[in-house]
A protein has these predicted regions:
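Proline-centered flexible-loop/turn and helix-kink motifs
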Residues: 252, 257, 512-517, 648
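Conserved small-residue
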Residues: 347-398, 497-498, 868-926
Length: 926
């Protein structure tokens, strides 16, 4: 019994072992016959799908498969370049592996299916000995013109060449007939060609129409031209480079619809133009537009035109509302040049020209002046002021020392002076690193004359050196870093006369003020003439010493952009960006002024020698003094942006942004103005378009200002806009050959202004020291003490502007573009000092208030023609028109001859006259 039991147990043990062996054999057979060796998929168990997808990325195909099956795709960011390429898939009830084979055809990618996961990765490189091939060819565009620098790469290898100056190429060591050559070129659709039996190729690349759509820089971002519904005008950089002036502002006049520019001086270094967008709509402070260079508030005066890549003018509320407090007067956006993918491109440019006075007034000569003065004297006293003998001596020039005849304006100015500009532009890069560097020099000479006999140089001249370097680096497929460094060094020399920043202006004033017969420029004995009441203009220009000024600026921007959608697909289209900027400006001046000893002729002695007397005892040597100053600005910005096209019809774009600016002025005249100027705000934008036909956009800016009390520091400035691109409608298809573009748009919004003229922290009162209260009739009975200086106004708040804009854009025959806008602005609560407060109120200085109202309306339009006549001739015409008229609706205006300052009676009284002359300038505009 025990033996039988033992045998029975052994049989059971052997039976179980045999079952295990059978299971292993069956498993091996199953794996052998059901799993393909190449794609590693279980074909018989894979689902079947029907797909009909046009021009979508491989990632979008994967998303569609995920939605219709239980499979999930896994891949790394390193594969995104090929996965973002677009394909078209049309299959009907095919298995998943067949679909994936088609999707990944002509790529270096393979896949592996494990349970419900599909892992996409690089194919293992299989080395198969083949006879290497040499492929030659020629690459042209759609017009048959050779393309230079086209990138040609054998797919999956590092075998790369580019086309030569004639569009020809030769690529060696091509693996074999199954190799694929990739042709890529900026602005053209990439092309892949299987080598096959070809050894010589003729390749034509088609322009990338989608990629070439014009992009317009807007507030805190960019938009495609067709989707812009704000009043935005762009200016080509080439138009800025025509003007030889130092300042870009001088090139704005007549170039941009809606921009009015006035240049008041041509003196080197002091020739910057004042400019306004759509006229002047306020009699308060802060009427100039906000200027942003690479997104940072900066001046246009010392940017070289060669640095600029794009120039946009934002005019209506929709375009400027995101700037809130700073956008009331419009915004100018300047983008400097960025690197482009391709081999290094080096451009050297040199300009040389001459400057001359455009128009000088014609003055009467000395004799005519004396005759006219005699006529005037006859009316007043009945006597002549000058004898006929003196008039004849002046006319004949027999004794210019005693009878001078001087045209002072011509005496102190040259007929023409040279100026020049040289620039070096280097641009290029790869997909990982793009670079741009611009070096520029600008030099010009002023119009004032010099005296070769003087041992020092009094010429008016300027030299400026600019540099701008921009780097864009893709650290990963989803992370980009932008670094921008720029600045300038400027040396300027002016005559030592005057403490004004623009001495030439004062010298010109002297030339207008002095009569032609007061004295000659210099006496025949070398002495410099001048009477006790007037300054010799020629001596002011040539013998007053000199001032040497050195100015420098360093500008920097650092930005990091993270494409969140590439890290997590459900957030496709979402990007985060952080920006930091630090700018510094410094200047110093060495003042080597000299007061010249001057004389005045009294006659001649018996021997004919000139007799003179000293009118002013001057210096024996050049004086020495120095001045210095500067400022610095820090800016911080963080933003989230979203852009997504849904179902091929619905385009949604959004922006949420926070910014902060800190500015310190080292030139402050008092302690209160030396404190940092700080602003911060939030901005947002949401836009939607349907099929590229209908557009709607909302913006707002929420800004804080230090100028107001606690309850009024923050202001909310919203806007809304809508547009209709008629030519994208189906019923317009037959008219597109003539009417290539027709778009209507309109906007309404609110923007703000917080600038006060000469009054910081206006909600706070100030305490001054002085004579205190006075009594009596003589005006000198003051008792020393403290008194209230500026009266603080707690409820001071924002100056607000309500803006309305209606515009139309018309394109004809794809070469004529017309843009026209009607605008209306109403500016309320304008900051001003009250004028009608009686003296009995007891204010030492009139308080500030939100009081004024100004309406401004008009229209601007531009016409642009760009027509090509064959390959060798191109016609470009541009014109614009701007009309603006404003009306002062409310102004706290004093009565005729009414005092403007409620102060003690012995102080000077200012009179305000209600005249049309003021309103013709500020009321009716330009």
């Amino acid at each position: 019994m025990r033996k039988m039991a033992h045998l029975k147990l052994m049989n059971i043990y052997l039976y179980k072992r045999m079952l295990n062996v059978q299971r292993i054999v069956l498993l091996l057979l199953y794996v052998t016959f059901t799993v393909p060796s190449l794609a590693e998929v279980a074909t018989m168990q894979l689902p079947q799908l029907s797909l009909n997808l046009n021009n979508v990325t491989r990632r979008e195909v994967f998303n569609t498969i995920e939605k219709n099956t239980k499979y999930v795709f896994i891949y790394s960011d390193e594969l995104l370049t090929e996965l973002n390429e677009k394909v078209s898939i049309h299959v009907n009830k095919q298995t998943l592996d067949k679909i994936l084979d088609k999707v990944l055809h002509l790529t270096s990618l393979g896949y592996k299916i494990t349970n419900r996961q599909i892992t996409v990765s690089k194919k293992a490189q299989t080395v198969i000995p083949k006879t290497p091939l040499k492929i030659t060819g020629h690459v042209t565009d759609e017009k048959g013109e050779a393309l230079i620098g086209v990138n040609i790469q054998e797919e999956g290898t590092n075998n790369v060449v580019i086309t030569d100056m004639d569009g020809n190429f030769s690529i060696y060591n091509v693996s074999g007939p199954s190799s694929v050559l990739q042709f890529t070129y900026i602005g053209f659709v990439p092309l892949k060609i299987v080598v096959g039996k070809q050894t010589n190729m003729s390749v034509k690349l088609d322009p990338d129409i989608k990629g070439l759509e014009e992009v317009v820089v807007v507030g805190y971002g960019s938009q495609k031209r067709e989707s812009v519904i704000g009043a935005i005008t762009t200016m080509k950089p080439a138009a800025l480079q025509v003007n030889q002036s130092r300042s870009v502002t001088n090139a704005l006049a007549g170039q941009v619809a809606g921009v009015i520019a006035v240049q008041r001086s041509g003196e080197p270094g002091n020739d910057t133009s004042d400019f306004w967008i759509r006229g002047i709509s306020s009699f308060g402070a802060g009427t100039t537009p906000l200027v942003l260079v690479d997104g940072i508030e900066r001046s246009l005066s010392n940017i070289s035109p060669e640095e600029i890549e794009s120039f946009s003018v934002l005019k209506d509320a929709t375009a400027t509302a995101v700037y809130g407090v700073r956008g009331a007067n419009g915004v100018i956006l300047v983008q400097t040049k960025r690197g482009q993918i391709g081999k290094p491109r080096i451009q050297i440019k040199a300009d040389y020209g001459f400057s001359a006075p455009t128009m000088l007034p014609e003055f009467v000569d000395g004799a005519k002046y004396m005759e006219v003065m005699n006529v005037a004297s006859q009316f007043s006293s009945g006597k002549d002021m000058y004898t006929q003998a003196a008039i004849d001596a002046t006319r004949n020039g027999t004794d210019p020392d005693l009878y001078p005849n001087v045209n002072w304006l011509k005496t102190i100015t040259k007929d023409h002076v040279p100026n020049g500009r040289v620039s070096l532009d280097i641009n290029g890069g790869t997909e990982r690193l793009r670079y741009s560097m611009v070096l520029a020099y600008h030099g010009e000479t002023g119009m004032t004359v010099t005296d070769p006999g003087v041992e020092y140089n009094t010429s008016n001249n300027l030299s400026r050196y600019n540099i701008r370097t921009n780097l864009d680096m893709n650290l990963t497929p989803s992370t980009e870093i932008n670094v921008s460094l720029g600045g300038y060094i400027m040396n300027q020399r002016t005559p030592g006369f005057s403490t004004n920043a623009a001495p030439f202006t004062d010298i010109i004033y002297l030339a207008f003020k002095n009569t032609p017969i007061v004295h000659p420029t210099v006496y025949s004995n070398g002495q410099i003439p001048a009477n006790t009441s007037q300054t010799n203009p020629w001596a002011a220009a040539t013998h007053s010493g000199f001032i040497s000024s050195y100015k420098s600026s360093l500008q920097s921007v650092f930005a990091v952009t993270q494409d969140i959608g590439k890290l997590w697909h459900p957030l496709k289209g979402l990007k985060a960006k952080a920006t930091f900027s630090f700018d510094t400006y410094a200047w110093n001046s060495f003042l080597r002024r000299k007061t010249q000893t001057t004389y005045m002729a009294t006659g001649r002695d018996e021997e004919g020698n000139l007799l003179t007397s000293i009118t002013n005892q001057g210096d024996d040597y050049l004086q020495y003094a120095k001045e210095a100053g500067g400022n610095r600005t820090m800016y911080l910005e963080g933003q989230l942006s979203y852009s997504r096209l849904l179902a091929d019809n619905h385009q949604i774009d959004g922006l949420l942004l926070y910014n902060m600016r800190d500015y310190v002025n080292a030139d402050a005249a008092s302690a209160i103005y030396s404190l940092p100027y700080r602003t911060q705000g939030i901005a947002a934008r949401l836009s939607y378009s349907y099929k590229g036909r209908y557009f709607i956009e909302g913006n707002f800016g929420y800004n804080g200002s230090e100028n107001f009390s606690k309850g009024n520091k923050w202001g909310f400035f919203p806007s809304v806009a809508g547009g209709w691109l008629v030519t994208n409608e189906k019923f317009m298809e037959n008219a597109l050959s003539v009417l290539s573009k027709l778009k209507f748009r309109g906007s309404y919004g609110l923007v703000g202004n917080d600038q006060l003229a000469g009054r910081r922290f206006a909600f706070l009162s100030t305490i001054n020291s002085g004579n205190g209260f006075t009594y009596g009739l003589t005006g000198n009975q003051g008792i020393g003490g403290k008194f209230e200086g500026d009266f603080g106004v707690e409820d001071l708040s924002w100056e607000t502007v309500k803006k309305t804009d209606i515009g139309v854009e018309i394109g004809l025959w794809d070469c004529v573009n017309i843009q026209a806008d009607y605008f209306h602005e109403k500016r309320e609560d304008i900051f001003m000092q009250r004028k009608t407060i009686p003296e009995t109120a007891g204010f030492n200085t009139n308080p500030w208030a939100n009081f004024g109202i100004v309406k401004n309306q008009g229209f601007d339009a531009s016409l642009e023609v760009n027509k090509s006549f064959g390959k060798d001739f191109f016609l470009s015409l541009r014109g614009n028109f701007t009309f603006s008229r404003n009306e002062i609706v409310e102004y706290d205006e004093s009565g005729d001859y009414e005092t403007n300052n409620p102060c003690t009676y012995w102080k000077s009284i200012e009179h305000i006259l209600r005249t049309e002359s003021y309103r013709s300038v500020s009321g009716r505009g330009f």
